[in-house]
């Protein structure tokens, strides 16, 4: 009744070209706690990377085509940095998502606040789940991320330490990345 429709898909469906992001005005990439995980004490190749190279390419193409992207996840920066062996993932973060990693394990209290920025509609104080419960995943180790391009600004900070929790960019496309 609000006039908006929603389509949900897996990142694999984007990677396998089953879903064309260009068909959508906005994309909300919810990563949650997804990050590269070493399996069987390293006997098996790592899995569950938040931004596999094929997804990076699809998101870059979408953004460069004028798409609007919202990304959230506890390891949104640290997974790109820690799984990067060639520098390509860091370039993707800086050139497409317009952020750089400051640190992992950035906060423990679960509160962010908006800060002065060109984005006047992003305002208020917010809490995210930081305690174990049976209803929702817990953000145990959020990332602090900082702007990495002209036109990118910190829009949220962790209330307990003032580290940057969210970065927004508006240029040829719009992207907002949240480290929680």
Each predicted region: which residue ranges?
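A glycine-rich, often tryptophan-bearing local segment used as a flexible ligand/cofactor-contacting loop or short
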Residues: 35-141, 150-152, 159-160
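Aromatic-Pro/Gly-enriched surface loop or interdomain linker
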Residues: 1-34, 171-173
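Segments surrounding the PLD/"HKD" phosphodiesterase catalytic module and close analogs
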Residues: 80, 179-180
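Carbohydrate-binding surfaces of carbohydrate-active enzymes
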Residues: 1-6, 60, 65, 93-95, ...
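Extracellular/periplasmic catalytic domains that process cell-envelope and extracellular macromolecules
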Residues: 19-23, 62-65, 147-149, 169-171
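Short, surface-exposed beta-strand/loop micro-motifs that present aromatic residues
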Residues: 142-144, 153-174
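Structural recognition of the beta-strand scaffold that forms the well-ordered cores
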Residues: 6-8, 25-31, 63, 68-73, ...
